[in-house]
Design a protein with these regions (language model features):
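Hydrophobic beta-strand-centered segment that forms part of the acyl-chain substrate-binding groove
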Residues: 29-47
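A generic structural signal for short beta-strands and their flanking turns/coil linkers
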Residues: 36-40, 59-61, 131
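Hydrophobic, well-ordered secondary-structure segments
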Residues: 15-22, 101, 107-108, 121
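Non-heme Fe(II)/2-oxoglutarate
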Residues: 1-32, 50
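Catalytic core of non-heme Fe(II) oxygenases with the double-stranded beta-helix
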Residues: 42-114, 141
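Short beta-strand His + acidic residue motifs that chelate non-heme Fe in jelly-roll/DSBH
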Residues: 51-54, 121-128
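A short hydrophobic beta-strand segment most commonly corresponding to one strand
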Residues: 63-64, 129-143
Length: 143
């Protein structure tokens, strides 16, 4: 993304600090010129709308920035990426971070969620009478 007058470029420039923080958390080397915004799109979910579970192939990191997130607009859900094992885990005596099957995040306006693109994720139904609005994007890390 080279056109500095385009909104996606300005948006990506503004969030670089957060992308760098994610790299540090994962223990990855961060080189600003090597992280590329490859795709960007917006989703408007009306009452009852949801996003089914999916992954983002051909990217390293994906993100969702919630522009509008009224109360009861749903939760962001991440599933265990070990798809083959999901139904084969033994019954849990104590739920822990190591045996968790899903993680949910209550969406709030202004949230920026950045996560590995291989993680299966979905967004639960919007139960609000107001629209839920999100700008999502994918990042590719050059070598």
């Amino acid at each position: 993304m080279k056109d500095k007058d385009k909104a996606p470029f300005k948006f990506f420039t503004d969030i670089q600090k957060y992308v760098a923080d994610v790299f540090r958390e994962y223990g990855w080397y961060y080189t600003p010129g090597k992280v590329n915004l490859t795709e960007m799109w917006a989703i408007i979910n009306k009452r009852g709308n949801f996003n089914t579970e999916h992954i983002h192939p051909n990217s390293n990191l994906s993100a969702a920035y919630y522009v509008k997130a009224p109360d009861n607009c749903g939760e962001f859900k991440v599933s265990n990426p070990h798809a083959i094992s999901r139904d084969k885990f033994p019954e849990r005596e104590n739920p822990t971070e190591l045996n968790r099957l899903i993680a949910k995040h209550k969406i709030e306006e202004g949230d920026l969620l950045i996560f590995p693109s291989y993680l299966p994720h979905s967004v639960l139904p919007n139960e609000s009478d107001e629209d839920r609005m999100v700008v999502s994007f994918n990042l590719w890390i050059g070598r």
